[in-house]
């Protein structure tokens, strides 16, 4: 505690420094023994002295249940590709620490005498499908660079293709790495027949959001911080309840597939956040589920050589949802 702040009650001190909680909340934390002064619990809302050392011993948060089953699709002893279930966070963040794929991998492989496979990239919590991991740091670095290079080259190639009105199939195919996603979107909204492809070049930028301050959504591309983004969307199947699409992305922007589908008037079926136009609903958050999005196919050239082509074995929760809905 610095001299100008001496004499304040502890609750006033904390409420002024940490505005996420009011004074009454800090008084409750004092009573619970969470605040320590000079190595001892400060159970009363005492006035502070200059030089006091305060520690807030925050209790661990409660993490909700997540699906903990995942299938290993490929493993060569270094590179590992898994089929991540929807609802499982990949890395600790946003209130998730132990109930994450990273922690599951650490617990599964700890004590096995080999390096632990660790994720090379992210998938959204409610995105299922293929996730690339690697045991050796140099392999993770190589794969991460390969993914970045294919994304950057794909974005440049998509822009060039758009300028001449063709070449959408090149999106996501550059640099020896290709990723394809599948998703359910609201029915009848796309100006496509099955098998036809649409190139989407809507920019993505941060805009005001009442809950989060700012959030990523569709943008004009004219404001500072707006990011160029490109996706190639192909309509695969139509049904009265939902349409099945395949998407290749040439830029790894936040929530890109959700935003781009919504931007062209075909939001992901069940997406509570992004509606037609690609703007964010004020009452929803990015981590809210309900949509069906899958990292379906992966093509890459591993450091060991050769070509690796994998598809998610769960043939899409999308198809399961169609069956459950009586399609």
Listing of model-derived features with the role each one plays in the protein:
Residues 1-327:
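RNA pseudouridine synthases
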